[in-house]
């Protein structure tokens, strides 16, 4: 005997209602996954329990993309169908759309921070883990890139400083070499000034043949007598000129 058709109505028993919700939810998620795989369709499924607990399924964790596509499509369709006089209604719908989008972003942010994870299924947790891993890879890649660029910049600065130091060392060595040469030159000049002056050539006294050793020193004897070995001898020089002794001069001639 076959199973009878179940009548669709609200289950009054709270426990039975919760059990049925869990079973039907699992079957619904399974069907959504099957149709997305078999038909290569983009599927987005959102379910709220009677307690307000959220359950969702999306193809390849692209819930946001699917919802944005749905919103653009439905908004464009409504714009074509809605009359121009229904401007206020369109603004209200746009407000509701943006509000729902903000709520979705806030919920995803809480999930990324590790909050409100109790309502997520194992599949959703796995998708969230993959998203976080991908984000961490991007962060590490960017960090490594910045570190590599910083290291290259520091290496360039180090090379420039080394070249500058080499140039300064070369200039210092050249300057020291010049100063050393100048110091040696100054030392040589100072040694030349401190040496005693050279002796002049020896001057030989050239005596005139007429300047002999017997050169009389004329003198005047006042009131005395001039005595020689030979009192009567005449002093004779090399010119054969006789000099009268001074004492022979009569001093009386000077009296006048």
Curated annotation (Swiss-Prot):
Induction: Negatively regulated by TFL1 and by the C class floral homeotic protein AGAMOUS. Positively regulated by CAULIFLOWER. It comes from the Eukaryota. The keyword Isomerase does not apply. Residues 88-178 form the K-box domain. Pfam families: K-box, SRF-TF. Residues 1-61 form the MADS-box domain. One of its GO terms (cellular component) is nucleus. InterPro entries: MADS-box/MEF2_TF, MEF2-like_N, TF_Kbox, TF_MADSbox, TF_MADSbox_sf. Keywords: Activator, Coiled coil, Developmental protein, Differentiation, DNA-binding, Flowering, Nucleus, Transcription, Transcription regulation. GO terms for biological process: cell differentiation; floral meristem determinacy; flower development; meristem structural organization; positive regulation of DNA-templated transcription; positive regulation of transcription by RNA polymerase II. Residues 88-185 form a coiled coil. Homodimer capable of binding to CArG-box sequences. Heterodimer with SEP3, AP1 and SVP. Binds AP3/PI to form a ternary complex. Interacts with the SEU-LUG corepressor complex when complexed to AGL24 or SVP. Interacts with AGL15 and AGL16. Interacts with TT16/AGL32. Transcription factor that promotes early floral meristem identity in synergy with LEAFY. Is required subsequently for the transition of an inflorescence meristem into a floral meristem. Is indispensable for normal development of sepals and petals in flowers. Positively regulates the B class homeotic proteins APETALA3 and PISTILLATA with the cooperation of LEAFY and UFO. Interacts with SEPALLATA3 or AP3/PI heterodimer to form complexes that could be involved in genes regulation during floral meristem development. Positively regulates AGAMOUS in cooperation with LEAFY. PANTHER family: SERUM RESPONSE FACTOR HOMOLOG (PTHR48019). This is Floral homeotic protein APETALA 1. It comes from Arabidopsis thaliana. The lineage of its organism: Eukaryota, Viridiplantae, Streptophyta, Embryophyta, Tracheophyta.
